């Protein structure tokens, strides 16, 4: 019985789930926009929002806490040098989830996850 167990299992073991969300966090930090299924996007908030909050105060302890989740030096570097100062004045709500239809093949609901206040590149203006 799964009484009072929060979060979704996604039919994965806990280590697989931890690795999946760690990789998704790294991809979101690196690219600032990813496309995934809607349930995964909603659960990704539980991982990325506290990471960005930790990155607002740049200390050795907070960098180690972020590295414990991300396991990527480049992602931790960008998180603390770029994203932390960018979201310093924002009290929360660092990501935006936009529904974007259904996936071909299995009709899974898809979503785009992007960081708020993302700088607009020239590729985005052409669309």
Swiss-Prot record:
* Keywords recorded for this protein, A-Z: Ribonucleoprotein, Ribosomal protein
Q: Please provide the Gene Ontology terms (biological process) for this protein.
A: translation
Q: Spell out the GO cellular component terms annotated for this protein, sorted alphabetically and separated by semicolons.
A: cytosolic large ribosomal subunit
Q: Which spans of this chain does the record mark as coiled coil?
A: none
Instruction: Cite the record's note on assembly.
Output: Part of the 50S ribosomal subunit. Contacts protein L32.
Cross-referenced PANTHER family: LARGE RIBOSOMAL SUBUNIT PROTEIN BL17M, RIBOSOMAL PROTEIN L17
This chain belongs to which protein, by name?
Large ribosomal subunit protein bL17
The lineage, from the top, is:
Bacteria, Pseudomonadati, Pseudomonadota, Gammaproteobacteria, Legionellales
């Amino acid at each position: 019985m799964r009484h009072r167990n929060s979060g979704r299992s996604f039919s994965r073991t806990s280590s697989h789930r931890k690795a999946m969300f760690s990789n998704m966090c790294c991809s979101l930090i690196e690219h600032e926009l990813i496309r995934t299924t809607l349930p995964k996007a909603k659960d990704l908030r539980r991982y990325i929002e506290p990471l960005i909050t930790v990155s607002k105060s740049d200390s050795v302890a907070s960098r180690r806490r972020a590295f414990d989740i991300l396991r990527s030096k480049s992602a931790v570097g960008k998180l603390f040098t770029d994203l932390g100062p960018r979201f310093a004045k924002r009290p929360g709500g660092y990501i935006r989830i936009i529904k974007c239809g259904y996936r071909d093949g299995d009709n899974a609901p898809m979503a785009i996850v992007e960081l708020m206040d993302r700088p607009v590149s020239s590729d985005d203006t052409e669309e």
